[in-house]
């Protein structure tokens, strides 16, 4: 996908929604929507809110797939049990949906879970992190680098 300046308004709507909710962190689906609207290809994805919906939508996305917890409290999802890789079939989707939500709640009991992101798994892909902030001296700053469990290693 090529960047189209007319998509700037769509990005601004997502950012305003995040800001209006009082969050400083975008949910996984929101951040990936911003990346996609910026002209960068992302794997097929959908945010689901029940195991039944997860089963139905997983068949549309295809396998293997990844599940990621969607919660503003999930900055490091992997460490909190909020990521499952390599899901191969519908039965596993149902089992893992229950497991990922209960494991995450076990790690962060007061967390509000907005849903679970189902995403097509890309074999041998590199995990990336993208972030942004407004620095008083430099203005808007974008951070881009290796993501996943390596984020803390290089911090």
Annotate each language-model stretch with its function.
Residues 1-155:
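ATP-dependent carboxylate/acyl-activation modules
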């Amino acid at each position: 996908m090529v960047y189209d300046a007319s998509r700037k308004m769509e990005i601004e709507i997502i950012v305003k929604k995040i800001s209006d909710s009082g969050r400083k962190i975008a949910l996984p689906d929101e951040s990936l929507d911003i990346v996609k609207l910026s002209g960068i290809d992302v794997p097929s994805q959908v945010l689901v809110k029940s195991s039944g919906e997860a089963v139905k939508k997983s068949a549309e996305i295809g396998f293997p797939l990844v599940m990621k917890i969607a919660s503003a409290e999930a900055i490091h999802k992997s460490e909190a049990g909020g990521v499952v890789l390599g899901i191969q079939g519908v039965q596993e989707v149902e089992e893992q949906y229950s497991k990922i939500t209960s494991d995450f709640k076990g790690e962060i009991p007061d967390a509000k879970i907005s849903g679970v992101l189902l995403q097509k798994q890309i074999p041998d892909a590199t995990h990336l992190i993208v972030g942004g902030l407004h620095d008083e001296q430099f203005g808007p700053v974008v951070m881009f680098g290796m993501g996943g469990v390596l984020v803390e290693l290089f911090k």
